[in-house]
Amino acid sequence: KGVEVLEKAGIMVHVGILEEEAKRLNQSFNKWITQGMPWVIAKVAQSADGYMGINSETSIWLTGEVSRSHAHTLRSEVDAVLIGRQTALIDDPSLTVREVHGENPKRVIMDTNRTLPLTLNLFNDKKADTYVLCSDQRFTQTQTHFCNYLPVKEENKKLSPIHALKTLAKEGISSVLIEGGQEILKSFIEAGVIDQIFIYTAPKKLDDAQLKNPIQLSEEWSV
């Protein structure tokens, strides 16, 4: 109707200019509105031989300054950063924006049984809101001094990635950056819900490594 009004007023109107560019700029909002799910970005660091780490109990740095700065830029551009219980326990991260300018994203942890200790940084630093996704079979939505607990449906005794994303969308979250470990990453890949992937590859191999990067890029993915 707006175009019609302008044309009747004698104003020349061009429709569809830079349409694809506009879609890319608004991709997270468009998906949130049309599908009820956030735009999902996965970030993973790997060794030259494709391993994310030694094992699930050990934290190891694989990236350099440039890739870390890019990771913080990604954090500054999304509504929320998502990790799993194991990453929260081992790294005790804050998931804040550093090295670049930007606001801290919301922090989301997938913790099926709500067993994470409330002494973690994510529950105490007050730098951003923290959400814990837990099983809807055992818990109800609860807001506490430390975080907001959001119940999510289970599939095969694990939280459903699709329902997790729909739950976050209802909280107004339109974009999510996954920084979780192998298990979280694999579950979201298998659910087919990842829209964009960034892989940082270190110029070294890991001896005796067990955590293989689950991402196997098909021809559908552009590099």
Where are these regions (language model features)?
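Zn2+-dependent cytidine deaminase-like catalytic core
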Residues: K1-E21, K106, S187-I189
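Enzymes that bind and transform nitrogen-containing heteroaromatic metabolites
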Residues: E20, W32, W39-V223
